[in-house]
C-alpha cells in the first residue's frame, strides 16, 4: 500500500487536491439551498411560536394579542414592510413623520394580524403537524426566498399560504404573506394608495391614528 502511494509524483498532488476539493464542495449545499433552508426554518419557528402562544390558556384576550404581536415582530421586518406598503409615497413622507407612520403601521396592521391569528385558538388544540406543512421553497430574485406551505383548518378546504422572506443582517425575515395567491403587502399598498389619492399623506396618517385609537 505504501509503495502504491509513493508512485504519485509531486506534480500529480495539486490535481488530486483540486479533485478532493471539488468532491467536498459537491457534497455541500449551495448558497441558494442554504438560504432557502434558513428561510424555511424561520417560517417553521414562527408558526411553532404562534401555535405555542395560542395553546396557552389566557383569559385576557388583549394580553394574548400583545404576545402574538411580539411573536410576529421577532420574525418579520416591520419597518421594511411599512415602507413597502407606502410604495412611492415613502419618499414624499417628511422624515419628521416617518417614525410616527411606522409606529401607527405597527399598532394598526400588525395588531390586526395578531387579532386574526387569535381567532385560531381552537385549531391550535390540534397538533401543529395536522394543521400546517411546509411544501417547498425557491429563490426569488437576488435577495428573496418564497416558502410555500399548506394550512389545514379544522373547517373548510386546505389553503395555500406562501411566505416571502428577504435576507437581512441577521438572516431571512418575513416581508409578505400570500394567501391563495393574494399578497397582503400588495393589498395593503393598494388600500393606502387609495386613501392618499382621496386626500394626501396627512389623510392617511389621520386615518391610521383613528384606527389605532379604536383598538
Please name every model-derived segment.
Residues 176-215:
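Low-complexity, intrinsically disordered terminal/linker segments enriched in charged
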Residues 1-9, 16-27:
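N-terminal secretory signal peptides
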Residues 103-107, 111-159, 214-215:
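Surface-exposed, charged secondary-structure patches
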Residues 36-117:
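Early exported N-terminus immediately downstream of N-terminal targeting peptides
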Residues 158-186:
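Short beta-strand edge/turn micro-motifs at domain boundaries
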Residues 28-34:
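Sec/Tat signal peptide C-region and signal peptidase I cleavage site
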Amino acid at each position: 500500500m505504501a509503495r502504491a502511494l509513493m508512485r504519485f509524483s509531486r506534480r500529480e498532488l495539486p490535481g488530486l487536491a483540486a479533485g478532493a476539493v471539488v468532491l467536498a464542495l459537491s457534497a455541500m449545499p449551495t448558497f441558494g439551498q442554504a438560504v432557502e433552508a434558513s428561510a424555511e426554518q424561520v417560517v417553521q419557528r414562527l408558526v411553532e411560536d404562534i401555535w405555542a402562544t395560542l395553546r396557552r390558556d389566557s383569559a385576557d384576550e388583549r394580553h394574548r394579542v400583545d404576545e402574538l404581536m411580539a411573536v410576529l415582530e421577532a420574525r418579520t421586518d416591520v419597518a421594511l414592510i411599512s415602507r413597502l406598503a407606502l410604495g412611492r409615497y415613502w419618499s414624499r413622507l417628511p422624515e419628521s413623520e416617518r417614525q410616527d407612520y411606522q409606529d401607527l403601521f405597527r399598532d394598526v396592521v400588525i395588531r390586526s394580524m395578531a387579532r386574526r391569528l387569535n381567532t385560531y385558538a381552537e385549531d391550535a388544540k390540534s397538533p401543529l403537524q395536522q394543521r400546517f406543512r411546509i411544501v417547498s421553497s425557491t429563490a426569488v430574485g437576488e435577495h428573496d426566498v418564497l416558502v410555500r406551505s399548506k394550512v389545514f383548518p379544522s373547517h373548510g378546504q386546505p389553503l395555500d399560504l406562501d411566505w416571502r422572506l428577504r435576507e437581512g443582517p441577521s438572516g431571512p425575515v418575513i416581508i409578505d404573506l400570500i394567501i391563495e395567491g393574494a399578497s397582503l403587502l400588495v393589498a395593503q399598498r393598494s388600500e393606502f394608495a387609495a386613501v392618499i389619492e382621496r386626500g394626501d399623506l396627512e389623510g392617511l396618517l389621520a386615518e391610521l391614528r383613528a384606527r389605532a385609537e379604536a383598538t
